């Protein structure tokens, strides 16, 4: 009996399923495991201060041998504990911001869901073309924030940033769920201009929102994508340590220094995305 032209042979189906199952299984040496943990420490720290830790951990996972999508998915999951650790480290600066969290968190969560789905169904080039432009705009907002604050001082600004910030956080959540590098730069730029608040308190709020973006996207990835659980574990260990270190260092930076760090990280993000 001949095979139906619309159905793959059983052995081809089995091979496809086996290949998909093994995508997340890569033989990792002890040295490579240490490198992944150290990358997690650095990423957890830089994510707490500003963001873009993915620019370190994603290439490391690729270098170890994980396929791009598996590396991206596992990276998102592995950095969740570090994001939560960093948010906890900044809990003092979160005091009095419960209203903002309640208003903006749904935007981040919805964006993360959309972004995670886009990662699975769309080619990378369809989304990444605009990413450098978004980061560049965010950097301009961060640098111009003091000047803009003076110009807007006489205008009434919404305590929670208004509709414009909600939409901006939603769009940043989409990007964060899809890839995530420099997500923090985008959120910091938006909140710094649309809210009249000290940059350290803005950073604390950013840590909460980006942590939930990673968490929601990560949970979805468990069900709709391949996950390399060893990589997740190694990154989680490192990122928790890095998150606490980042909180201690970040809150000691004066506003001008923190803006300088944001600009440097943002420029590196643009360069790496354009050249990869």
Model-derived segments and spans:
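Cytoplasmic-side transmembrane-helix entry/capping segments in multi-pass membrane proteins
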Residues: 98-107, 131, 155-161, 203-209, ...
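Selective hydrophobic functional segments
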Residues: 73-127, 133, 214-257
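N-terminal amphipathic/basic-hydrophobic helices that include classical n-h-c signal peptides
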Residues: 1-27
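Selected transmembrane alpha-helices and immediately adjacent juxtamembrane segments
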Residues: 24-67, 154-203, 233
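Hydrophobic alpha-helical transmembrane segments in multi-pass integral membrane proteins
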Residues: 115, 171-179, 217-225, 232, ...
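Lipid-exposed faces of alpha-helical membrane segments in multi-pass integral membrane proteins
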Residues: 34, 38, 42, 81-84, ...
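Membrane-interface alpha-helices at helix entry/exit sites of multi-pass transporters
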Residues: 66-75, 98-103, 196-207
């Amino acid at each position: 009996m001949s095979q139906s032209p619309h159905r793959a042979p059983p052995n081809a189906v089995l091979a496809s399923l086996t290949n998909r199952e093994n995508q997340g299984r890569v033989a990792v040496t002890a040295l490579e495991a240490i490198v992944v943990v150290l990358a997690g420490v650095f990423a957890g720290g830089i994510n707490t201060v500003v963001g873009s830790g993915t620019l370190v951990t994603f290439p490391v996972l690729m270098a170890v041998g994980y396929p791009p999508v598996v590396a991206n998915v596992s990276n998102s999951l592995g950095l969740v504990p570090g994001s939560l650790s960093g948010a906890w480290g900044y809990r003092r600066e979160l005091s009095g911001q419960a209203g903002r969290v309640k208003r903006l968190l749904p935007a981040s969560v919805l964006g993360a869901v959309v972004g995670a789905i886009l990662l699975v169904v769309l080619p990378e080039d369809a989304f990444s073309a605009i990413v450098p432009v978004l980061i560049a705009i965010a950097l301009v907002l961060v640098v111009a924030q003091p000047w803009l604050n003076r110009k807007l001082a006489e205008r009434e600004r919404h305590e929670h940033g208004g509709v414009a910030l909600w939409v901006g956080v939603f769009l940043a959540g989409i990007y964060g769920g899809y890839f995530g590098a420099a997500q923090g730069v985008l959120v910091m730029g938006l909140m710094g201009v649309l809210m009249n608040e000290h940059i350290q308190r803005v950073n604390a709020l950013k840590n909460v929102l980006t942590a939930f973006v990673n968490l929601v996207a990560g949970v979805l990835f468990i069900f709709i994508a391949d996950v390399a659980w060893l990589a997740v574990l190694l990154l989680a260990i490192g990122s928790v340590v890095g998150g606490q270190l980042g909180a201690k260092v970040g809150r000691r930076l004066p506003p001008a220094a923190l803006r300088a760090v944001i600009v440097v990280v943002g420029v590196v993000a643009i360069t790496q995305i354009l050249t990869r």
